[in-house]
A protein has these predicted regions:
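Short amphipathic alpha-helical segments
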Residues: 14, 65-69, 86, 90
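Charge-rich, solvent-exposed alpha-helical interaction surfaces
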Residues: 14-17, 21, 40, 47, ...
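Amphipathic alpha-helical binding modules
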Residues: 73-105
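Amphipathic alpha-helical interaction modules
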Residues: 24-68
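Short cationic/low-complexity microdomains
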Residues: 2-9, 59-80
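Short terminal alpha-helical segments
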Residues: 1-32
C-alpha cells in the first residue's frame, strides 16, 4: 500500500548526481573572483535544468520524497565542506525547480 510512497531510489540517484555535479563544477571553497566562475555557473544551471526536466518526466514526487531530496542534497554538500547558508538555499532551490518542472510536464 505504501511501497511507492517511501521508494526513494530515483530521488537518491538524482540527489547524488546534483551533489557530484556541484562538487565537480564549483568545489567547496572556490574563489568567487575567478574569471571563469560565471561561465561555470551558467553551464551548471543549464545541466541542472536539463536533468531536472528529464527527472520529472519519469518521477512524480510526494512530500516525503521532496523532503528526502532536500535532505540528501543538504547532507552531501555539507559533507564536502560547503557553507551551511549556501547549502540550505541551494537545496531548497533544487526542490523548487523539481516542483516547477513537475507542473509544466
Amino acid at each position: 500500500m505504501f511501497g511507492r510512497f517511501f521508494d526513494t531510489t530515483a530521488v537518491d540517484e538524482y540527489a547524488d548526481w546534483v551533489v557530484e555535479e556541484v562538487k565537480r563544477t564549483l568545489p567547496a571553497g572556490f574563489d568567487p573572483g575567478l574569471k571563469n566562475v560565471s561561465g561555470k555557473v551558467d553551464r551548471l544551471d543549464r545541466r541542472l535544468s536539463e536533468r531536472t526536466a528529464s527527472f520529472t518526466k519519469s518521477a512524480k514526487l510526494n512530500i516525503y520524497q521532496k523532503a528526502r531530496l532536500a535532505g540528501r542534497i543538504r547532507e552531501g554538500m555539507l559533507a564536502f565542506g560547503y557553507p551551511k547558508p549556501f547549502v540550505e538555499s541551494f537545496s531548497m532551490d533544487i526542490v523548487k525547480r523539481v516542483m516547477v518542472a513537475s507542473r509544466t510536464r
